[in-house]
Amino acid sequence: MDEVDKIIMHQLHQVDAGIEPTDELASFTPELVVRAVSSCLTEIRPELEVPRSLPGGAMAQRFSVATGLAERCKESGYHGDIGYQTFLYPNPIELRRLLMFLIEQLPRERQATDDLTGKSHPLSGREMLQRQIRKKLTAQLKAMWVPQFCRAVGNRKSHGCSSLCIDFRPKLNLNVPSANLEERTKEVQQYFDQQAPNLFQQTASSSYDLIASVLHKNDLERWGQGLTDSGMFLLASEDPVIPMVLATEKPSATAAEMTPLEELTDEVQKLRTQCETLLGERKAYTARIGALKQRESEATKELADIQPLLKLHERTCLVLADPEQNVTKLEALLQATEAKRRTLTQQWQDYRLPLLETLETLKTAKEAQHVQSIRSGIEQLEQELKEKTQQHNDLNTALRTATQSLAPRKEYTRRIHEFIGNIRKQRADIFKVLDDTRQLQKQLNVVGAQLQRQFNYTDDLLFQSAKHDLHAKKAYKLLAQLHANCSELVECVALTGNVTKQIRELEVQIDGEKLKNVLTSLQQITGDIQKFEQSIQELQSQISTMENGVAKA
């Protein structure tokens, strides 16, 4: 099983780089078993959340972690005998079966990628983090989006939203009289006293909210007459809702007279018409102001272009007023400017030559320093090349040694084919033995039936003759005794076969128990039981201390 263990360790190292390869599975500790199984389960089913390590504290936590991993393995399709003892008290045989099953269940995507790249490498911490982020984002993108107010309180909290859920109910334009009594006529006051519904009656419907309606009414009274920059009333688009009068409304005296409500409606209509007229005038004035501003900007730009030309014309006119004197002044100014230029040129040359010499010196020094750095770099590279060459030779030597010491891949393949051939051969031998056993059983049944029929026939003949012949009577007794002895012999042979079968089964079971390291497992179980007893004693001492404290208090 050394080759199988090496293959298992190689696969585990590819799944989790923290699992160092060892020579055999017998050296696996419970912590290493938990880490290997959890890594394989995470690769097989990424949505599972399994513990990556075994707690080192209380035994109850260790038992719960081991039991959870055993259940996850059963959910993944493992049908073997598995429980918490598989992880806390591992034996090489059961552990080899479990790890071989998990390795067979690993996804083939990683193996295909390794085959394409020509090499296999364990997952680094960065790759594992990227894989977890990719899985998390994929799960979130596949999940259905639900608005915040449609989620439950716990769901909203888990998504970082507020746990408050406020039902939306629209506002209502309340019909409330003005607080100034002087602004209300007698008819309006009579209407609000007798016919108009109160606030609670206006917001009695479940679709309106009283507080929102009152706030809306206050905003209307405060900002209703103001205009926005776009020339629209702030709340003019909302038509006031005229509530229905109650059943106690009295009919008007005459149809020709207008009710206060109709007068208010007529006044509102007039104000609305006047407002629309004012808005149209305002739009016209705004357009006219924009055109005037455009003309002003064009005139300002044209003025800025004309001012330099005007200054030039003014200076030209001043020169042409006295041409001879102005030409003499210009010639004198040119001569003075030329002399000043020559002086400045001489001063610049005197200042420039030392700077050029200094610049050449600095360039030469810099080039020399650069050449020196290049030489030192070349020497360093030569030294590194020698070291790399020596390292390459050493690695080639180690590779040849390792290639000679380790069996190649073909050798592993050949051994696997040999194992498969031996298994097939054993299977064929088993089937052959079973067929021979069935044929022998058939022959035994046929011979037994023939003997039974022969005995019955002989028994009938001797029984008929025994009535008249003494020798026939003795022969009948001997026949009955022979039949009884033969039956006892057959039963003895059957019992011997059953005992032999049970002996072989017990021998196989004994060999299996020897391989499971029962003594080591019993020692570990004894240690765990002692830890349990110690923790129970500590709890009992704490309970007694608390009881004494309570009794004293």
Swiss-Prot record:
InterPro entries: CCDC22 (IPR008530), CCDC22_CC (IPR048348), CCDC22_N (IPR048349). Residues 261-404, 498-553 form a coiled coil. Keywords: Coiled coil. GO terms for biological process: positive regulation of ubiquitin-dependent protein catabolic process. The keyword Coiled coil applies. Belongs to the CCDC22 family. This is Coiled-coil domain-containing protein 22 homolog. It comes from Drosophila pseudoobscura pseudoobscura. The lineage of its organism: Eukaryota, Metazoa, Ecdysozoa, Arthropoda, Hexapoda.
